[in-house]
Amino acid sequence: MKNLVVLTGAGMSAESGISTFRDAGGLWDKYPVEQVATPEGYQRDPALVINFYNARRKQLLEVKPNRGHELLAELEKNFNVTVITQNVDNLHERAGSSHIVHLHGELTKVCSSRDPYNPHYIKELKPEEYEVKMGDKAGDGTQLRPFIVWFGEAVPEIETAVRYVEKADIFVIIGTSLNVYPAAGLLHYVPRGAEVYLIDPKPVDTHTSRSIHVLRKGASEGVEELKQLLIPAP
């Protein structure tokens, strides 16, 4: 089977009702990104940051995967699918995708404040545990913090993502502005002979001269059309 590698951004989950910090409305309107999505913001006011992510976790319990998520999972019948996502939700998992690389962390996990990427201190939260409190400790005795890659922090999974992109036969970009690095740079690792598709209702600057099939649609409609293009009807 061919290797199908999909890079998804906020537009993938927007149809499920998850607000992004680039959109008006929603949780992100109440706080500047610097307050709730940087290491400095966390050091300044850990309680504010922890409560902000508690609210995001609660929101995640109230939304469902959309048809786009489900269609990507269905493509596993025909392709070796790897989903590389900039999203921190678990909607790809809940839709049935089995191979996902989370570049920016996972909302459903918490970790050590001192050593965020030490696997011994990363904990998966059950749905009923969405609320983390000040004083909840990781295995090393530090405050449990969200397992999120904040602005200014390294992206440990980027090398894993590059390895999959370098082997792609088909590379698909869905719902990302390609403005956030290092994820935006993944396009440069796509092999020369691979097909590239871009699904987004808005124009996106891909910063490349290579040929790209553009589907100017939202995630669900775009993935539906992509499926028809990749698997023609008999």
Curated annotation (Swiss-Prot):
Any one cellular-component term (Gene Ontology): cytoplasm
UniProt-listed HAMAP family: Sirtuin_ClassIII
Similarity field: Belongs to the sirtuin family. Class III subfamily.
Superkingdom of source: Bacteria
Subcellular location per the Swiss-Prot or TrEMBL entry: Cytoplasm
Keywords: Cytoplasm, NAD, Transferase
Predominant subcellular localization, coarse grouping: cytoplasm
Protein task: NAD-dependent lysine deacetylase and desuccinylase that specifically removes acetyl and succinyl groups on target proteins. Modulates the activities of several proteins which are inactive in their acylated form.
Coiled-coil ranges (or none): none
Binding site for NAD(+): 9-28, 86-89, 175-177
Domain comment (free text): 2 residues (Tyr-53 and Arg-56) present in a large hydrophobic pocket are probably involved in substrate specificity. They are important for desuccinylation activity, but dispensable for deacetylation activity.
Matches recorded under Pfam families: SIR2 (PF02146)
The UniProt record lists the keyword Ribonucleoprotein: no
PROSITE patterns: SIRTUIN (PS50305)
Residue sites binding substrate per the record: Y53, R56
PANTHER family tied to this protein: NAD-DEPENDENT PROTEIN DEACYLASE, NAD-DEPENDENT PROTEIN DEACYLASE SIRTUIN-5, MITOCHONDRIAL-RELATED
GO molecular function (one): histone deacetylase activity, NAD-dependent
EC number: 2.3.1.286
Catalytic activity: N(6)-acetyl-L-lysyl-[protein] + NAD(+) + H2O = 2''-O-acetyl-ADP-D-ribose + nicotinamide + L-lysyl-[protein]; N(6)-succinyl-L-lysyl-[protein] + NAD(+) + H2O = 2''-O-succinyl-ADP-D-ribose + nicotinamide + L-lysyl-[protein]
Deacetylase sirtuin-type domain location: 1-234
InterPro entries named in the record: DHS-like_NAD/FAD-binding_dom, NAD-dep_sirtuin_deacylases, Sirtuin, Sirtuin_cat_small_dom_sf, Sirtuin_class_III, Ssirtuin_cat_dom
Enzyme class, first EC level, given as a word: transferase
Name under which the protein is recorded: NAD-dependent protein deacylase
Taxonomic source organism: Bacteroides thetaiotaomicron (strain ATCC 29148 / DSM 2079 / JCM 5827 / CCUG 10774 / NCTC 10582 / VPI-5482 / E50)
Residues annotated as the enzyme's active site: H104 (proton acceptor)
SUPFAM superfamilies per record: DHS-like NAD/FAD-binding domain
